[in-house]
């Protein structure tokens, strides 16, 4: 039975995720698609449970009246049908309603909704641009997804379960008492109005504090994660105390916010406690007055007082439920600000890129990171199919930006990039990047096994292809000697977040093996050998030459000797091409390239 209710909702819908809407309610509703019928059923069972509970109070009052006036000899015979009905209600209906409510809430909605939010939000965020992740902490983004999903679950649960139970329960109480004498309902009605005023005054303030608290929690988490992620830098510069102070400042801001929330909650508790005492006093006073005037039976007086006492405990529970509700709303609002951001790079047409030759055309392109000028201005560059082109320039000249634009990590602000006469903006990002192999200076590795990291370039690769790629990248020898803390060896060893268990050169060789395995028709080498020593560079020279065969290659390097043998060298300065030609032609020209060459020696891609 549990499995049946667990499988009523698919937590992993296959449809492409849409941009979540702005606004807390619309944001939550967006993730409830396919669950709304069960949300309604949850509300109905919660309301039914509350109505039955009040009905039981009414029956107990009636029972008191019967026991005080009816004949013991004929009591069971006279009231048999009512007693049987109430017995069946208590022994059968109440457990069944409670069971259905729990199955819908605990098995169908809460686990599946939490995972559904995480699944859809994660898929949506994976399609965000590189700039989105560069502008925020990875830990902070992850915290928004994890905490936001729990908060959405809490909001939906309290709306459909808690508040449905409360609303139906309060209405049922008023109806029960008013049917006896409307004056018996007055204390509860007044209590309800005053309780609502307390909530109206306090809850918006709680909501604002909760949203601020969620943001400060994310900042605090981001700072802590940032320290852990860059622990080598922290230790290298002996800044442990600096990092603790940096984290402490965010913790203090969070703590101040917590004290604000707890202070407001304390005053709410004081006001509600005073109101509850007033309710019991007023209820007792009204009941005594009605009894003295023979307007209420002992049974209904017992019900009235019992309901007042029930409301006293009920109000404390409700106050904290509402407190949690608004805290969850604040968390949702904070998560929404990150998760609901529109994609900056969008697939306008889901057409695959078809690389037949590998011709690349940069046509009058411009990109300024949102500024008026700078970075790249009106750049034109044609790269023939199979041509090997080296990009040269000082730091900040725009070399890596040019590669990022080719990979469509950013959209052009002007101009056009074509691959085999196909505008890269009109093809899917996945197909574009699947056609380009990249080895960068900053090689990040997933926190998985060495094997998983390498076959990331080609998940369908065989073990033989994997071994061959590692051999060509001069990586097989050190991989076979790896062992992690769990005892995994060789290709099954976990390499750790960002490859912290490997040297820079080892990470670089794994990256080269990964691209060898990918075997894409276009190859980008962005400082691909910067982390390799001269001995290893020389060892993989032949491998890189084989890798470049039959491919269109764009290589970026500060060490000019590594790209001197390229078919053509392009010198970029301040986002514009100022020189291009072969190595010898540029030396003869005596320009920027010649000056840079004079300062450098060595290299692995020889001139012969």
Give the positions of each predicted feature.
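Juxtamembrane helix-loop junctions of ABC transporter transmembrane domains
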Residues: 10-21, 52-61, 65-68, 90-138, ...
